[in-house]
Amino acid sequence: MIQLVGPGGAGKTTIGAALAKRLGARFSDLDAEFTARCGDISAYLDANGYEAYAEQNVGLYFDLVDGPVRLDIMALSSGFMTYEDGIHPDYFALRQRLASSPATFVLLPSVKVEACVTEIVRRQLRRPFARSAEREEQVIRQRFVAYVGMSARKVETMQPVEAVVAELIAALAGGRQG
């Protein structure tokens, strides 16, 4: 299964849906699945806290990948690769597997921190559930190092969606190129 990871606003859902359409594949967005099963993510966080959300989200991931419907492409939640190791009994091994899989792609507007932060904040503030610019900047700065530190291939998304899709298809066809 192809898995797209990265911060909120990196383009995981848009690019995942376009990639699925181009490949005739099945696409799932973990945030959309969470919302369908558990309700609004912000409300869930307010009522239960981040740790409960992360635990539920990892459990949902396993339910989906182990379920009866085969998934070809999945966009993971923005913080999925940054949860605490003990959040779920199988999370540490899963995170290690995802980080090193040739079918996992880290989507970032740029691999340069300042360009990435600026673009993520700009994109996130256009969303209806956006936090303040300061909070969005804090979140991406905290998570950026984790994303660029993953051994999975990084794909910059400050280009047309079709160009990103073409890059993903080429990488999948040719193996991992770093």
Q: What residues fall within each predicted segment?
A:
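Conserved glycine(s) of the Walker
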Residues: G11
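Glycine-rich phosphate-binding loop used to anchor ATP phosphates in small-molecule kinases
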Residues: A52-S101
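A glycine- and Lys/Arg-enriched "phosphate-lid" helix/loop adjacent to the NTP-binding pocket
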Residues: L98-V145
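Residues at the beta-strand->loop junction immediately N-terminal to the Walker
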Residues: V5
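NTP-dependent small-molecule kinase module
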Residues: I2, T14, A18, R22, ...
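Conserved substrate/cofactor phosphate-moiety recognition/catalytic segment
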Residues: K21-L60
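The conserved Walker
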Residues: G8
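Short glycine-rich anion-binding loops that position phosphate/pyrophosphate groups of nucleotides
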Residues: S77-M81, S110-K112, P160
